[in-house]
Every structure is written in structure tokens, then in C-alpha cells.
Design a protein with these regions (language model features):
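Bacterial carbohydrate/catabolite-sensing allosteric modules
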Residues: 3-190
Length: 190
């Protein structure tokens, strides 16, 4: 179940547009073997929430008739999981030319595994993260990532709560905040 499927007032990032912009960037650089390293989240009685980044990645790849199954991995949203998922790809001999990670922490773990397997970033494998964590600009090479506007989310969230409570609106309000691609040095044309 995706968060959007709940019948509640909600504010979320426009994950689909964000993922599409990252994947458009990679395909524009010539990449076809694009791995996805994501995480799983659960709510309540351990009900799996479908991550919007996962859904958008699959939709994009299917729409463009690009085979993603050998390059698709889901673990958790941690550094260690990023390392493990990337190593699984190497062990299965499914070596992508690019990696799209569901967050910057996973991307950093993947970058560690890439280096440990004697590949170079971006010469051999390009990497894109998500969230634009502060450290992402200072690692080597600086990580290309999707900027998630936390401040804007807070402002819009407060406005949404105010409007919903003061106007006694019965229908749930839903809003999406745009994200933007921040191009740094972890990707290259092939």
C-alpha cells in the first residue's frame, strides 16, 4: 500500500517527477543498465508501504522497455544495506553502468562497495542519491542527488494543517512538493 492510498490529508514530495528527472539524466548520459537500490518501510501491524521511488523507477523502466529486474534490489535505508545490495549485484555479475539509490545513505554504501570491487566512480559506474544530505557535497566524488526540500515541506505542512482545521474540510487534502536534481561529479556520459 502506498501512502497516497490512505484517505487522509497528506503532504509528500513529488517522488515520481524526482525519480524521472534522475533517470532522464542518466539515460541522457547514455546509461541503459541502471540499478535501483531501495528500502522497505512498514507501518502498524507490519504492513508494507510501497515506496514511491520504487514505484516510479519500475514505471519509468517499463515505459521505456528497459530491463531492470537484474538490477533491482531492496533492503533497508542504511549505509550497510547499500554496500550489501551493491555487492549482491557484483556477486550475481549484474554490473550496472549507473546506480540510482533511494537515499544518499544507500548511495554512500554503494559507493564504498563499488570502490572495494575496484571500480571507479564515475568512470565505471555513475551514482545518484536522493535527499541531498549535507555530506553528499563533500564526499569524493561529490554525489549527484535529488534535493528533498525539507524546509518547504515543513512550511507547506503547517499551512495544510491550518487550512484543513480552520475550514472544517471533510475531504482529505493532498499536496506534492517538487524536488530538483543537483548535478555534481558522480555521473558521466558513456
Amino acid at each position: 500500500m502506498a501512502v497516497d492510498e490512505f484517505n487522509i490529508t497528506s503532504l509528500s514530495m513529488d517522488f515520481e517527477h524526482a525519480v524521472y528527472s534522475a533517470l532522464d539524466y542518466l539515460t541522457g548520459l547514455g546509461h541503459k543498465k541502471i540499478a535501483f537500490l531501495g528500502g522497505k518501510e512498514y507501518v502498524g501491524n507490519h504492513e508494507l508501504i510501497t515506496d514511491a521511488r520504487t514505484t516510479a523507477y519500475k514505471k519509468y523502466m517499463n515505459h521505456r522497455k528497459m530491463d531492470y529486474k537484474p538490477y533491482f534490489k531492496e533492503g533497508s535505508f542504511t549505509f550497510e544495506s547499500g554496500c550489501n545490495m551493491m555487492n549482491e549485484l557484483f556477486n550475481e555479475n549484474n554490473i550496472p553502468t549507473a546506480v540510482f539509490a533511494a537515499n544518499d545513505v544507500i548511495a554512500l554504501g554503494a559507493m564504498k562497495a563499488i570502490r572495494e570491487n575496484n571500480f571507479k566512480i564515475p568512470n565505471d559506474i555513475s551514482v545518484i542519491g536522493f535527499n541531498d544530505e549535507e555530506t553528499s557535497a563533500y564526499i569524493e566524488p561529490p554525489l549527484t542527488t535529488i534535493h528533498a526540500p525539507a524546509y518547504d515541506m515543513g512550511q507547506h505542512g503547517a499551512n495544510l494543517v491550518y487550512v484543513a482545521s480552520n475550514l472544517s474540510i471533510k475531504t482529505p487534502l493532498k499536496a506534492k512538493i517538487p524536488c530538483e536534481l543537483v548535478v555534481r561529479e558522480s555521473c558521466r556520459r558513456i
